[in-house]
Amino acid sequence: MRPISLRLHERPITQVLFNREGDLLFVAAKDKLVSLWYTTNGERIGSYQCGGVVYSIDVSQDSKYLITASADAKARVWDVSSGRQLDSTDFEVSARSIEFSQGDKQILVVTDQVMGCQAKIHVFDFDKDEVRKLNKSYTLPSPQCKITQATWGPLNKTIFASCEDGAVRIYCTEKRELIKTILDHNKLVTRIEWTKHRIMFMTCSKDGTAKLYDTKTLKLLRTFDTGRPINAAGISPLKPHVILGGGQSAESVTTTKVDASQFKVRFFHIVYGEELGGLIGHIGPVHSICFTPDGKTFATGGEEGLVQVNHLDESYFEFDDDLVYNPPVQH
C-alpha cells in the first residue's frame, strides 16, 4: 500500500473530509486555506481562502455546498464547484466546529470559550434556494467549559458535544436542553466519531483512550488504550476495524522522550479490541482521519501540514478476521 502524499499546506492540518461519493477530498488547515483534491490520483482541484485558521469543515450530501468554521469568528458557505463564497455569519469569538444535519436542512456551529464569552452551540436553518443561506434558529445552553466538537445524533433528535472537562454532553434538539452527560474520560475529549448508520459512536481523548458506546443505551462497549493522546479516529464502514491517530502535542515533544513510531496510525479490531498493526507516515501528531464511504481508502492529516491518502490493497479485504480469532478446530 503506497500512500499518495498531498503537500500544499504550510501549517498543521485540522481536518480531512471525503464527500458522500468519496471521489473528492477536502482538507482544512491552520494556514487559512481549505484545499480540494481528487481522491483517486491526488490531483489538486483548487482551494477556498478563509480569513483565519480553519478549524472545521463539512460538505453537503450532494457535494454542492461546503461550510467552514474559522478563527476569524465566521461560519461560511461556499459553492464547491466555483469556489465562490455564498454566505457567512459573524460571531463574537472563533468558530470551532461546524456540521450539516442529516438531510442538510440545518447547520450547527460551536463557538469558543474565550474573552468572557461562554462556549455555545448555535443552530441555523440552511436554505439552499435563498440568497441568505444561514438563518439563526436557536442556541443551546452553555456547558460552562470549552467545547471541542459538536455533532448531530441519529435523525437529528440529539446533539452530542465533546468537552474540555472530559465529558460528552447530549442535548435534545426538540426541548433544546441538556439531557445526559457521559463522564468516562479524565482529560479533554478531542473528537466524537460515528459508525455507519450511527448505531455506535467513539470518543477520543487526551487521556490516551478511545471509547466505543452504543448510541441507544449509551452503554460503554469497549475501551482502546494507546498510552498517548488520541486526536482522531476513523471507523471503517466495511470491516470491523478502527484507525486511531494522535501523539504527543507539539509543545510537549521537546520535554519528553519521543520517537517517530508514536505518530503512526494504529489499526484496532473494533470487536476484540486488539491491535492489528500500524502505519508510519507522519513526523508529528495526527490530527484527523477519515474513511471514504466505501471503506476502500482513508486519509490522514498531521501537524507537519502533510496529508496521506492510502488506497487499501486487495489483500486487506481478503484478510479474514475470523481465521485469526476463531481458528478452525483441529480433529
UniProtKB/Swiss-Prot annotation:
HAMAP family: eIF3i. This is Eukaryotic translation initiation factor 3 subunit I. SUPFAM superfamilies: WD40 repeat-like. It comes from Dictyostelium discoideum. Keywords: Cytoplasm, Initiation factor, Protein biosynthesis, Repeat, WD repeat. It is found in: Cytoplasm. GO terms for molecular function: RNA binding; translation initiation factor activity. Its main location: cytoplasm. The keyword Protein biosynthesis applies. One of its GO terms (biological process) is cytoplasmic translational initiation. Component of the eukaryotic translation initiation factor 3 (eIF-3) complex. WD repeats lie at residues 8-47, 49-88, 142-181, 184-223, 281-320. Pfam families: EIF3I. Component of the eukaryotic translation initiation factor 3 (eIF-3) complex, which is involved in protein synthesis of a specialized repertoire of mRNAs and, together with other initiation factors, stimulates binding of mRNA and methionyl-tRNAi to the 40S ribosome. The eIF-3 complex specifically targets and initiates translation of a subset of mRNAs involved in cell proliferation. One of its GO terms (cellular component) is phagocytic vesicle. Belongs to the eIF-3 subunit I family.
